[in-house]
Amino acid sequence: MIETGVIHGRFQVLHLKHMEYILAAKMRCRKLYIGITNPDSMHTRDSVNDINRSAKSANPLTYFERYEMIRGAMQEFRVPESEYDVIPFPISCPEYILQYAPKEAVY
């Protein structure tokens, strides 16, 4: 088991497959950082893979709404709060990721 792991996703809207992904990652580390991509409009750029991915219509929920959904789901799955954290993950601006996520983690 590794000490610290980081995963990321948009989580627009959080669903069971997202939870399978999150819980599978949590099983592999003591502390998991769950990164929310496209946390705000300043850190969102057009995706070369899917031009609709960064559209406002494809991102109806705010960072805070997604944060609350993830925390609520983690409580429902009985994951202790001390074993995870939910963070912004500005995937479109990779130079800022380490402002939010630990450098020494496994990504």
Task: Name each region found by the language model.
Residues M1-Y107:
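Nucleotidyltransferase catalytic core that binds NTPs
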